[in-house]
Regions:
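Conserved, mostly hydrophobic/aromatic
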Residues: 1, 31, 125-126, 139, ...
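A metal-dependent hydrolase metal-coordination microenvironment
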Residues: 1-18
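Active-site neighborhood of phospho(di)ester-bond hydrolases with catalytic His/Asp-centered motifs
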Residues: 2-4, 29-30, 64-67, 90-91, ...
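Divalent metal-binding pocket/active-site signature
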Residues: 17-106, 124, 143-151, 155, ...
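His/Asp/Glu-enriched short active-site or ligand-binding loop at hydrolase and phosphoryl-transfer sites
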Residues: 107-121
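His/Asp/Glu-enriched, well-ordered alpha-helical/loop segment
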Residues: 133-138, 144-176
């Protein structure tokens, strides 16, 4: 199993020192990160940062980390640089602005998701990410439902790959 504390689930009474054993055993850490967009309880923001930094502080285990960045992309990218862990970081469904992405060009991986066939901003972001740093994801069946009202199935990943290829003018074989 994969271990992480999603920013939507962060509470002020989390005893972070108790999680190191879980992190040690997990092949990947995530989804962790910050969300200053969907999380309306601003008092949790400092706790989110604390949990996020704690997850990065155990990088002595050299794990890949799946990171949620909604509404605080620049802060996240700066924290990733601070902890010098960008090669192990996967930025989940980046939707920040292109300038932040360019200014904070790092060696992270980024995911493209089910919105690529529908949202121009997402298409523009995907064009900015080097193909060798791009991964595809569906973010679960309800993500597509959020985008177009249709409940997504696992094979939706094929459409994500096709959209990545169309946007970047690539053949599917070039993504291997």
């Amino acid at each position: 199993p994969i271990f992480g504390i999603h920013p939507w689930r962060v509470k002020n009474n989390i005893e972070l020192d108790k999680f190191e054993d879980y992190i040690k055993k997990s092949p990947l850490i995530g989804e962790i990160g910050l969300d200053f967009h969907w999380v309306e309880e601003k008092y949790t923001y400092s706790y989110q940062i604390k949990v996020f930094e704690s997850s990065y502080s155990v990088q002595k285990y050299n794990k890949y980390i799946n990171v949620h960045t909604k509404g605080c992309e620049e802060l996240i990218l700066n924290l990733i640089k601070k902890y010098n862990v960008s090669p192990q970081t996967i930025i989940h469904w980046y939707s920040g602005d292109k300038d932040t992405l360019k200014i904070n060009r790092c060696k992270c991986y980024f995911t493209g998701s089910v919105d690529l066939g529908y949202i121009k901003h997402s298409k523009d972001i995907i064009k900015e990410i080097p193909v060798n740093k791009l991964l595809a994801e569906t973010d679960g069946p309800t993500a597509l439902q959020w985008v177009n009202g249709v409940y997504g199935m696992p094979d939706e990943i094929k459409n994500v790959y096709e959209n990545i290829c169309t946007i970047n003018k690539l053949d599917i074989e070039e993504l291997n």
